[in-house]
Amino acid sequence: MNPSKYAVTFACYNQVDYTRQCIDSMLHHGDDLSRVVVIDNGSTDETRDYLQSLNLGGRIFNNSNLGCGVAWNQGALAFQAEWTIIMNNDVIVSPGWIENLIGTAERNNLKVISPSLIEGPLDYDFKSFAVDASRKMKDSIRLGTQHAVCLAIHESVWMDIGYFQPIPKLLGYEDTMFFQELAKARITTGMTGASWLHHYGSITQSAMKKERGLAEKDGLGYRYNYRLLQQSWLERKIKKIKRKRLESSWCKSELLQFGMSMYGHRLNNEFIWQ
C-alpha cells in the first residue's frame, strides 16, 4: 500500500513503556514511522525524550492533558491523508494490520473501520495468533459497529460530521459522541477479522483515576456526560439492549464458524470470546 494513503496518530499521557511497546511492534512489522504523528498530553515521565528519539512524521507536545478529542484532532489535522488511523498507545500491532484494515474498508465501501481485538495481559504469542486469525477471518465483517481502541477514518467523514469534540473534561466520552454522529449521518462502519491488535486495556485512564483518587470502578468523566447525547433514559436503554443482542449474535455465529470471535479477552491464560 502506498504510505501516502494513510496517517496514524495516537495520544499519550505518561506510560512510556506502553508507548515504546506499541512503536516497537510497528517497527518490527515494517510500518513507516514517518506516517505517524504522536501527541503528548503533558507527560511528566520519559515519554517526550523517547518521542524525540524517533523518526516520526510529527510530534506535538501539549502543555497539559487536553484530552483525547483535542489530541486526536491535532494529529488528524497535522498530517492529513485519505485515511487517518486513530488509535490508543497501549496496543501491539500485527503483520499487515494497516493494509488489511484499509483494504477491507475499501472493498466493502466502509468509511470507518476497526480491527479485531484481544484485550488483557500479553501472555500468549500474539504474532502467531494474529497471523492465523487474520487468515481464518479475513472475509468476516461486523457491519455497523466500531470501537475507539483503533479507528481508520476516511477523509470524507471529517467533511460530513466534523472532528471529535475538543472538550478536555469529556475524559473519554469523545468517542461516544463521535459514534453518535456517525450513526445519525448513516455513515457505513464495520469491524474486520482481517486485522488484529492486542490491547492492554485502558492503561492511561486507569493511571488518571489513580491521580484523582478514584477507584477503578469509578467513571473518569463527568457523571452527566450522557446528557450531551440528548437521548432519554429509555432510548439509551433500548439501544444498549439492541447492541448487546447484536454482539451476542455475532459472537455465536463466529464461534460456530471459526471457533473464535472478533473480540476476545485474556483471563487465566485463556481466551474468553465475546
Predicted features along the sequence, with ranges:
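A conserved acidic beta->alpha catalytic loop
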Residues: D40-D49
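A recurrent flexible, glycine/aromatic-enriched loop bordering the glycosyltransferase active site
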Residues: S134-S156, L171
